[in-house]
Design a protein with these regions (language model features):
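A cross-family detector of function-defining hotspots
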Residues: 2-57, 80-132, 267-283
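Non-transmembrane alpha-helical segments in soluble domains
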Residues: 7, 86, 171, 198-205, ...
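Secretory-pathway/luminal and periplasmic proteins that interact with or process carbohydrate-rich
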Residues: 16, 95, 199-213, 234, ...
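A short, polar/proline- and glycine-enriched secondary-structure boundary/capping micro-motif
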Residues: 17, 71-76, 139-143
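A well-ordered secondary-structure block
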Residues: 55-57, 62-114, 220-302
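Second-shell loop/turn segments in exported
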Residues: 67-76, 150-161, 178-190, 206-211, ...
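Intrinsically disordered, low-complexity
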Residues: 117-186, 301-303
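Short, well-ordered surface patches within globular domains
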Residues: 157-225, 270-272
């Protein structure tokens, strides 16, 4: 499918948040919520769908979907049980697991595409998100944790897009799973809080640490701080910090961290902000780290 064909289809879906941006990997990304401009839809209904379409040379090469209606050629759909995937020949994604070492995503090659289905490992263990890429582009190469010497000085526009997309993906998860016991399942994005998140992201990057409770923590302890926050640094959790990742990778990693997930679904939170920065560990090793302000309650309470 070409870019023009995509735009023709989107024009009939009352989409909002439709925009084109560059991903960190250099793809053109069209992001949208189907029905987002439909005045008959409720707040939650508008946030129940979020789709990212990846293009290279104006040709669609991949798609990430978070929606209760998503389905890929009858092979996998929203709500498919992880056990069913395994029975049908899907394999664990070895670089994407929970802190307990349990599978949180499954992969299968179909025709000329690689599909990754993300399952809610800390919930009902059913599929809530699907990512598909042409085999010419490796999803693992885009998201698997690895050292890199690629420039990570992303523009402010790219960082803003990453923040927005992460927020949208998390909201689609919250609405479709119904894990929040409140009338509105989706969180509201607060500009003031987002500004704090962005500033705090920069502070963390400048201090060379990750821990929200103590921005002065030395780098040698930052890995321990990640693990204490419920993130497995040696497996999927490290993807939160790698520079060569996409928004869906970060959002799903938040979901698969038990502590972050519990914070995310808490009924105490009705809004959130997301910040992003470039964090450099040492010469030749640049990593990308976005963070959610709902994990940093000490900062929010001061507003």
């Amino acid at each position: 499918m070409t870019r023009d064909e995509v735009n023709t289809v989107l024009g009939s879906l009352k989409t909002d948040v439709k925009r084109t941006a560059k991903s960190p990997q250099g793809f053109d990304v069209i992001a949208f919520r189907a029905g987002g401009n439909d005045t008959d839809k409720s707040f939650d209904e508008k946030y129940s769908t979020y789709i990212l379409i990846y293009l290279k040379d104006d040709i669609v090469v991949g798609i990430s979907g978070n929606a209760s209606s998503m389905n890929f050629d009858g092979t996998v759909s929203y709500g498919t049980d992880a056990g069913t995937l395994v029975s049908n020949g899907w394999v664990d994604v070895d670089w994407y697991k929970t802190t307990a070492g349990n599978a949180a995503a499954y992969s299968k090659d179909v025709d000329n595409a690689t599909i990754i289905a993300f399952a809610d490992a800390y919930g009902d263990d059913k599929v809530y998100s699907i990512q598909i890429f042409n085999n010419a582009y490796s999803i693992a190469d885009m998201t698997k944790c690895r050292e890199t010497t690629l420039p990570m000085n992303y523009s402010a526009d790219v960082l803003t897009e990453m923040e927005t997309e992460t927020f949208e993906i998390l909201n689609a998860y919250l609405v479709n799973t119904g894990v929040r016991a409140v009338d509105d399942k989706a969180l509201r994005k607060n500009t003031k809080v987002s500004n704090v998140a962005r500033a705090y992201s920069k502070e963390i990057a400048d201090e060379g640490c990750i821990d929200a409770a103590n921005a002065e923590r030395k780098l040698a302890l930052s890995k321990e701080a990640l693990e204490n926050a419920g993130l497995s640094f040696n497996n999927w959790g490290e993807r939160i910090m790698i520079g060569n990742m996409d928004a869906i990778g970060f959002a799903n990693s938040v979901i698969e961290s038990e502590r972050s997930r519990d914070t995310l679904i808490s009924t105490d939170y009705v809004f959130c902000g997301i910040g992003a920065s470039v964090y450099t560990e040492s010469a030749g090793k640049a990593v990308y780290y976005p963070n959610m302000v709902i994990d940093f309650v000490d900062r929010v309470s001061a507003l």
